[in-house]
Structure formats: C-alpha cells, structure tokens
Amino acid sequence: MTVLGALKNIAVGTVGKTTDALRIGNGLDARELQPVGWFAHEQAVEKLRASYAAIPSGENVRLAKKTSNLFRGRNQSTTPGLDVSGLGAVIAVDPVAGTADVQGMCTYEDLVDTVLPYGYSPTVVPQLKTITLGGAVTGLGVESACFRNGLPHEALIEMDVLTGTGEVVTCSPTQNVDLFRGLPNSYGSLGYAVRLKIELEKVKDYVELRHVRFHDVHALTETMEQIVETGEHDGESVDYLDGAVFSLEECYLMLGRQTDEPGPTSDYTRDRIYYRSIQHPEGVLRDRLSIRDYLWRWDVDWFWASRAFGTQNPTIRRMWPRDLLRSSFYWKIIGWDRKYDLADRIEAANNRPARERVVQDIEVTPEHLPEFLEWFFHSCEIEPVWLCPIRIRGTGADGSELVGEGETLGADKEHPWPLYPLTVGQTWVNVGFWSSVPVDLLGKDAPAGAFNKLVEEKVSALGGHKSLYSEAFYDRETFEQLYGGSFPAQLKEVYDPQGRFPGLYEKNVDWA
C-alpha cells in the first residue's frame, strides 16, 4: 500500500469510528420496549376520535402520518389528518396464549423488539422495519415465513377499526365478518385499524441458513414447490424460504431453519452486505444469523436498493453512520429525490434519458414463474429480483375456520379475503423488483408508465396479481375484476356511506 493509500485508510477509518459513535434515531440494535397498557391505548383512541370530529364534513379523512412505505404519490390536501400519534406501540402481550394486542401504527421494528424477549415473533415479519402492522394488514406484507404462515392478516384474532362513520367497530371471524374479511388489501379505503389482536409464534435464538445455487429458473421453481409441500430439503426442516434471481443462469433459494444451538453468527450491519453473501458458484453455502438479524437482514441495505445511494461502495460504507444503514433513512433520500427531481437532473447532466420508476411486487403461480422471469429478464436490465412463496392458510393452527360468513360475503373457503383473492391450497410466488428503466425503453413516444403497464398486462395474462403499494395503471373495469368486484363498494355503503375515505380505485390509481 502506498503512503497516500495508508493515509486514506486511516482517515476513512477515523471517520467511520466517529460516525459509528453517533446515536441516530432507532439505530440498528434491539431496544428494550414494554407494552404501553390499556389506559394509554384508550387515551390515544379518544385523541383519534377527537381529530376525526375536527375534520369538516365533506372533506376526505387521511392519516396525519410522517412516514410511508407506499411507492405511489398522493394528492396534496390542506385538511388536518387523523391524530394517530399515540397509536404506535404494543398494548399487551399474553405469553401463555401466544397473542398480542397491538396498535395499528406500531411498526414491525417495535413489535419485534417488544415480543422477542418473550420468545415470540409475529407469524410473518415484512422485510422493512417501518412497515406498520395496520399497514401490512390493510395492504400487503410478505416474507419468508409466508409459505407456511400465510399473510399477516391471517394471524388476526380481532380488530378495532375506525370506519368512515367515525365509529370504532370491533370485527373478528364471527363479529362484523364482512369488515374483518374486507379490510385486508383495502389500503385505507374502508377505515383504519386501531387495535389488532394477533397470534404470535414461538421462535428460537438463531437461524441456520442454506443458500442453494441454481443455474436455471426451472430447477429453482421445482425445488421451491417441493419445499413448500414438504417443509424440508435434503433431510433438514425449512422454517423460512425466499429466493434471489440475479440472472436466468444465476439464482438462489435461501433456506432458514430455527435453532437454539449456540455458535458464531455473521454480521451484515456494517461492512458486509447480506445479498452479496448469498452468491457463490455451485452447491450449498451455509451461514448463521441471530433471529433478530435474520428478520431484518433485508432492511440494512433495503434488499439491494442501497447501491443507488452509494452505501455499497466500500469507502462510503465505512464512513456512513451505522445507525443510518436502514430503509427508513433511504426513504428520506427518496423523498428528497421526489421533491427536487435529483435523479432526473443527474441523468440529464449525463445526457441520458429520465428514468421510469419500476417498483412492483407481483404474484404468479409456480407453473408460470419461469415464463414470467424469462420475459422480465429479456425485457429490461433490472436485477436482481426477489422471490417469496406464499400459501394462504385457510384455517387456523388448530384447524378452526379463519373467517366466517358475513351478511354480504358468503362462506368462501377458496377465497376468504376477497380484495386480494389468492386461492387457498395454491402456492403463489411473490416476485419483487425495485429499480427503474429509461423512459424511452419502449420507444421515444412511449406514454408515462409504459413499462409498468406492460408488467401489468403480462401478470394478468399469466393469471397473476399485483400488490397495490406502488403505481397502478388499470382502467376501472379491469381493476374491479382483479380486486374484489362490487364488494368494496358494498362495504363502503355500510361502513363509509358518506365517502369520507377515498375509494379503493381512487386511492390506488388516481392517488386520492
């Protein structure tokens, strides 16, 4: 190493030690959190009710919430929002029953840090720390336990929902069943979850990982299906299952097994990058993480999206404050980009076309997964993409019915959640891709959102679905065919007759 190189290394190391000493926000490490109790919750609900009453009649009702994990815009409003400032915690934990009562704006980061000391975890922990439990239930949250635990709303025992009438309505599999079944994937068009009672699952201290290399997506898909059906691979049980596709010739399944066996663990919260640790030329690569680090393995680098901010450059990473290696801070950078068009300005300065944001999660069945991946990798240069198999549970852990029959909804064991009708007994594979393409990828005269529209068409042609947390371009007729038909409108007549909340189509396509 040259003298200049040595001096640079010392300087970078010094800056890194200084920034690591800074305590910024929630940081990366576990915090000691206690349930807030019922009295504090009831006070927060009263504040929520008062803020609702203060919104002029005829005005749309929104949350007064600073953070979001939605990748679509929202029309600006000067009307004050709902005060949810006291609704961001766990209310109570019952370690004997394995349940928790949780406020709707509680982030999964806070939920995990509250219940993990009891030896429990939510049944599904979506990938990013600031996703809220209410957001995952009224939207969509997926992760590597979905192949055995279904989706977050399938862990629901009971909910209190602020409806468009200003009432807080309790719903469950046997009470106000239409609302209980209709709130998932409603994205705030019917109301907001104030309290959610959920089942938890026992977890062990560590996760043993096997990263299995494949050279084609057909072989990967076949193995994924076998694991979903059997819960094991090569004689070892599988508790967690997801995948990453870097190209059609380089793809991986990441298999996790819970264990209490002590031993060394890897750390991907500073210099090392988790998704890069997956890559290897052949066979199986093993790794170990603590259970908490496993649950948040994707948050540190926002899967792989942190590369857009320079944090995967070794020099920048060493100097970057450790506490800011988290998706919530990258979201702030995205906010600055949206406000000042930073990315488009950079492209223009380099004589390159502006970019069309392509941030989507879609689901197709395994039989159509290879076709979708082959089409996608031949159509754009976005890589890698994430895979997460999902299996709707249909019944509770004890075999009981998850949902009952409502006044509008009949008993439907195949499609218990009508606004996102994944079929019980059918494996679905979530495919996530979060990047951009040149706006002229499909031609200089291509309309806005051209590639996203092409994705929608391909997914529909394969009988799939698309999550609505990002931009959607469907016409109303197509949208209603895909997302609940007339049922959302029927529910609004009961729970939001004055239309205080924007409708599902208006919220997700028109950005109301």
Regions found by a protein language model. Give the residues of each.
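Activity-critical C-terminal alpha-helical subdomain
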Residues: V15-K17, A21, G25-N26, K339-A348, ...
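A short glycine-rich, hydrophobically flanked beta-strand micro-motif that places a catalytic Asp/Glu
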Residues: R62-L63, D239-F246, R357, I362, ...
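Glycine-rich N-terminal segment of FAD-binding domains in flavoprotein oxidoreductases
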Residues: P35-T130, A136-A145, L387, V459
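C-terminal substrate-binding/cap subdomain adjacent to the FAD-binding core in PCMH-type
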Residues: T138, I157-E371, H378-E381
